[in-house]
């Protein structure tokens, strides 16, 4: 697979980056990397995979953004993302929503770098696609430069892009 052009990427946002917005953005630019809304790995595991993961190939290049904290479920979701034709798999570590945090995914995982590393390692082992993260630079009391530096280095060791 050729390297994705990341000059411009449209950040994924719940209730915004749906298939209609991606179609519209693709009309404006053929090259920008688009993202799905965050899809929770548990929903993929238990739900209608086709309904959750299918997209129009005219949207490409498009990254599948996942949320979750189970290495096994995230690995399986990454595998399915490749099967459905996505160009990249992205783990959401940036969503600050209270509902998302209550379910132990999104930005709150910044407090658990070893769990995140386990999740990323499993995802990377299940796909040949690039695996990336969307993150914040801090979270609550984990907001010092040293925390960010250590967090990024732990993730980097997994091979995440």
Q: What is the predicted role of each segment?
A:
Residues 51-55, 107-109, 149-151:
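Short, hinge-like loop/turn segments at secondary-structure boundaries
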Residues 11-13, 37, 65-67, 92-94, ...:
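A cross-family glycoside hydrolase active-site/sugar-binding cleft signature
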Residues 23, 27-29, 75-89, 93-105, ...:
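Alpha/beta enzyme core
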Residues 1-8:
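Extreme N-terminal starter segment of soluble prokaryotic enzymes
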Residues 67, 105-110:
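Core AdoMet radical
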Residues 13, 70, 96, 108, ...:
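Gly/Ser/Thr-rich beta-alpha loop segments that engage phosphate groups in nucleotides
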Residues 13-87:
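Glycine-rich, positively charged N-terminal anion/phosphate-binding segment
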């Amino acid at each position: 697979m050729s390297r994705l052009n990341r000059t411009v990427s449209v950040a994924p946002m719940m209730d915004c980056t749906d298939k209609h917005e991606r179609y519209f953005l693709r009309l404006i630019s053929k090259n920008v990397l688009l993202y799905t809304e965050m899809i929770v790995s548990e929903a993929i595991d238990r739900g209608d995979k086709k309904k959750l993961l299918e997209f129009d190939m005219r949207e490409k290049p498009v990254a599948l953004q996942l949320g979750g904290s189970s290495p096994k479920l995230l690995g399986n979701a990454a595998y399915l993302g490749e099967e459905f034709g996505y160009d990249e798999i992205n783990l959401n570590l940036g969503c600050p929503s209270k509902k998302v945090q209550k379910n132990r995914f999104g930005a709150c995982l910044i407090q658990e770098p070893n769990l995140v590393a386990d999740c990323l390692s499993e995802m990377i082992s299940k796909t040949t696609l690039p695996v990336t993260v969307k993150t914040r630079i801090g979270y609550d009391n984990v907001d010092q430069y040293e925390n960010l530096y250590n967090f990024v280095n732990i993730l980097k060791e997994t091979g995440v892009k």
